[in-house]
């Protein structure tokens, strides 16, 4: 496994790869969710590239860029065990040199939910992913369903800019108690960690109501909110029942919908989602 920090050196390594190339973009501090993407990429491609880059342009001024967990030696050990071809781990100056000024604005799909709660977030995400696609030129790129809106943003960007990359979305990987795996879970103290299962419990509640025949959007949102309101440490940013294609809030679910939520547990903001299918 090669570890490369510069675009020039990476491009030389990429030129020597023949066959299908899969890309797994990450911000590091890897967990089993990331590794599930790596294994899927390994099964479907001749070569696998993992990028590790904590992207500053997707963090707001009051967000957790400075304390976002980082442990490159640990990440590299995990990836070595997965038999990855190349890890591309640039620094900020390599990705955003002096004078950098071009950003990708994806449009309406980036506006609601995470886009409303974190202004500028998806502008940063789309820009860095576009750059990584251009640098690594993969045939396929792998993302997790936990960041559902992000996957829609990246699909839209790839379509609109005619990027020759197949976007593959993989299932959420959960802890035994249902908490979606996230690098930010490390922020939680033991009491907060127990409370954090409220996100999964809220999704279970809305799925149960949906299976029982409830299709009213407000009633489904209320089912999630009731579970969150019963947890003293939980403070919701949003609960949503939205169209799976464009994320507009639904009055009534007629086919498929995305049930999603963002909740603060202490100072830690967590997200989760599930798909409701009629």
UniProtKB/Swiss-Prot annotation:
Its EC number is 6.3.2.1. It is an enzyme of class 6 (ligase). Pathway: Cofactor biosynthesis; (R)-pantothenate biosynthesis; (R)-pantothenate from (R)-pantoate and beta-alanine: step 1/1. It comes from Roseiflexus castenholzii (strain DSM 13941 / HLO8). It catalyses: (R)-pantoate + beta-alanine + ATP = (R)-pantothenate + AMP + diphosphate + H(+). This is Pantothenate synthetase. Homodimer. (R)-pantoate binds at residues 58, 150. GO terms for molecular function: ATP binding; pantoate-beta-alanine ligase activity. One of its GO terms (cellular component) is cytosol. It is found in: Cytoplasm. Beta-alanine binds at residue 58. Its main location: cytoplasm. It comes from the Bacteria. The lineage of its organism: Bacteria, Bacillati, Chloroflexota, Chloroflexia, Chloroflexales. PANTHER family: CYTIDYLATE KINASE/PANTOATE-BETA-ALANINE LIGASE, PANTOATE--BETA-ALANINE LIGASE. ATP binds at residues 27-34, 144-147, 173, 181-184. The active site is at residue 34. It holds the Pfam family Pantoate_ligase.
